[in-house]
């Protein structure tokens, strides 16, 4: 295990590891314990009582955070004809069809999110081995395979985040930057928590939200009382 820096160790002393803080208190602590010299991202981590190995307990989707993430997302849209024009008008950073497939195969990745119209997925599917491991493959569950490219681009630019449970039952989601007002971080935090509660698989047994923590990029994790996220 990597040795923690002096600043991190000092910051961690401010957090009671045995306590579960309210969402508001946790956000305040995250700011106090942030040791980064840049505007660090604040990330929420949810440990869920699901078995991702079972198809009916896999959780994946997307939600628009009311105050965005603080990051400007570069959007690539695979579309042609009128849909390509709509994507450009909506503010997509890159719009094209097969020309971008060749660029990506050659190692071009100057984008953060990929959207594709359903009729383009036959071609985009060729990029599965490249985009899949990076979490960039368009998917209907996250609203990135759609003919409504205007809505898709607008939502991404407005602060839409994707969530997906990993093999251990965890979901990590950015909820903003340390420069955000406390109230905005809390509202974003509650929005993603509420979304995850709504998509709870009916097959999941026992406690659903087992543990929730929030932390800045280089700061210690702060445990959150789940009841304060309602």
From Swiss-Prot:
SUPFAM superfamilies: Ribosomal protein L1
GO biological process, one term: regulation of translation
Source taxon at top rank: Bacteria
GO cellular component, as recorded: large ribosomal subunit
Species name: Bacillus cereus (strain G9842)
InterPro entries tied to this protein: Ribosom_uL1_bac-type (IPR005878), Ribosomal_uL1 (IPR002143), Ribosomal_uL1-like (IPR023674), Ribosomal_uL1/biogenesis (IPR028364), Ribosomal_uL1_3-a/b-sand (IPR016095), Ribosomal_uL1_CS (IPR023673)
Statement: the UniProt record of this protein carries the keyword rRNA-binding: yes
Gene behind the chain: rplA
Protein's recorded name: Large ribosomal subunit protein uL1
Keywords: Repressor, Ribonucleoprotein, Ribosomal protein, RNA-binding, rRNA-binding, Translation regulation, tRNA-binding
Function of the protein: Binds directly to 23S rRNA. The L1 stalk is quite mobile in the ribosome, and is involved in E site tRNA release. Protein L1 is also a translational repressor protein, it controls the translation of the L11 operon by binding to its mRNA.
Protein family per UniProt: Belongs to the universal ribosomal protein uL1 family.
Subunit structure: Part of the 50S ribosomal subunit.
